[in-house]
Amino acid sequence: PAIRMDCRSEDIGIWTAGSSIGAFHAAAVVCRFPDLFTKALSMSGTYDLMRFTEAKEPTDAFRVSSPLHFVPRLDGRHLDLLRTRHIQFVTGEGKWENIGESWRLANVLGEKGIPNFVDSWGPDWDHDWVTWRAMMPKYLDEWTKS
């Protein structure tokens, strides 16, 4: 990735972040490519995308793109490397939030020994850009100090 050239470091850890459906992508890209990405900040995520389809069962394409579906089948080097990564789930519990989405993927990851953490900001934080604008700097600040 160009970031390695820009930072003049071949082994710099690359982090990803996203909110709402972007939280899905942030977590999924770390799970798919642990050789490239080291951390994900997934804010107010939606992880079970089956509810947005008309299909009753996941298709093969779905199984390879959804961490809820492909992580349980991981093994070998890919899983070993993923166990050295970290996914931070952060969510409010206010309007339009569903912390259960974060817990569902966190539990799947935990069953495979993949480091993750769910952090609830409580009922005063809604599924909204104001929430994410407060969340992102907090975690980036913590991560850059560690």
State what each model feature region is.
Residues 1-146:
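Non-catalytic cap/lid and distal C-terminal segments of serine-dependent acyl enzymes
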